Amino acid sequence: KSVLDLCAAPGGKTMQLCAAGAKVTAVDHSPQRMERLRENLVRQGFTAQLVLSDASDLSVCSGFDCVLLDAPCSATGTLRRHPELAWIKDVGSIYSLAIEQRKLLLAAARYVRPGGELVYCTCSLEQEEGEEQVSGFLRTHRNFRVNPIMLACEGVEEDMITPQGFLRTLPCMTAGASQGMDGF
């Protein structure tokens, strides 16, 4: 499977995709973060095509079986580990991030081959950055649909699936982890 990993650095998901046998093209706009991704790939013995570019303007990339967009976000899902976020994030910053996420999501859709998959995720608890982002996208892109998360997927529990079929984890959930998990 060919996978385009947008906003890929530092590369955790890139390496998981490589380990699963995918042919990965990893994109990030930051030279420093891309170098960290490259180092991580080398250290783990994986290879991927690395593209230093803004994810919203990749004229040479198209026709991927799957496009993964882990969009820049408020990171409110990491409150369990970073409680200070509750005091430093404001509505204005979330609104600005939502605008950027929308641009990236629209761009990501252009890189998916017909019949391919687009995976959108953030580590935010904010509806504006998650479910509302996807719902708004689907209203204007009728050729895309939600593939509901199945309980048969490893590690997925019933309370993690929203009525719309989205996967939503919260810091209060444990799913076998003794110290909880991040919100996604």
Feature names for model-found ranges:
Residues K1-F184:
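S-adenosylmethionine
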